[in-house]
């Protein structure tokens, strides 16, 4: 009995140390955005090939090849700064995600859509929360926008939380708006207006 009690105490001490270590690691995590270059093809391919596709649009090729990465990077080179902001997400010096804000057109030209993807092993580290904050600031400064919109499948709670932490408001839910394979999802419409603080 005494031995079991000692093991339980040791377990609790180790668990507490592990939690403190994770919290410290999150504090020290440095997240930056960088412009994509052609030299980043393999990093982009790795991110898109390993992406959890449950809540992504089907337009992203699967498998995602180096040729797909090349095509996308060429498109970004033409559009960046004019029709959107397209960045690699860098955490502790390594490219771990992709994030963009793409302008809409016609009567929606003062609006843009936010999109992002992060390697699954990097989830729950605060990386995308920081990346969204940074790209929204850049997009409002560079693209003459009144708002940024984000569309999220209703069950994607982690992504919704990222947006809410960055001052996005849930503006509505489009019922049965997404059909992916055999699944039907509601689509949450989030918005952030120029000048709104977190």
Locate the predicted segments by residue.
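Conserved GNAT-fold acetyl-CoA-binding loop/helix
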Residues: 53-75
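A short helix-loop-beta-strand connector motif used in the catalytic cores of GNAT acetyltransferases and
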Residues: 74-88
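Intrinsic disorder/low-complexity segments
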Residues: 9, 58, 70, 89-92
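Positively charged N-terminal leader segments that act as targeting/secretion signals
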Residues: 1-12, 16-21
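Intrinsically disordered, low-complexity regions enriched in Ser/Pro/Gly/Gln/His and often acidic
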Residues: 14, 29, 64-65
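Generic signature of intrinsically disordered, low-complexity, basic-rich segments
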Residues: 2-4, 65, 127, 135
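Acyl-donor (CoA/ACP) binding surface of acyl/acetyltransferases
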Residues: 17-54, 86-198
């Amino acid at each position: 009995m005494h031995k079991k009690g000692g093991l339980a105490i040791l377990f609790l001490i180790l668990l507490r140390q592990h939690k403190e270590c994770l919290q410290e690691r999150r504090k020290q995590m440095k997240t930056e955005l960088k412009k994509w270059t052609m030299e980043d093809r393999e990093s982009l391919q790795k991110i898109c090939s390993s992406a959890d596709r449950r809540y992504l649009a089907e337009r992203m090729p699967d498998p995602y090849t180096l040729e797909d990465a090349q095509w996308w990077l060429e498109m970004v080179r033409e559009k960046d700064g004019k029709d959107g902001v397209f960045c690699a997400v860098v955490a502790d010096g390594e490219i771990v995600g992709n994030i963009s804000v793409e302008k809409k057109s016609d009567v929606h030209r003062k609006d843009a859509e936010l999109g992002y993807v992060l390697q699954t092993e990097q989830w729950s580290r605060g990386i995308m929360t920081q990346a969204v904050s940074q790209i929204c600031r850049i997009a409002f400064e560079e693209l003459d926008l009144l708002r940024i919109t984000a569309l999220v499948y209703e069950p994607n709670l982690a992504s919704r939380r990222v947006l809410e932490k960055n001052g996005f408001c849930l503006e509505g839910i489009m019922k049965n708006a997404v059909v992916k394979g055999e699944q039907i999802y509601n689509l949450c419409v989030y918005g952030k207006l120029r000048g709104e603080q977190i």
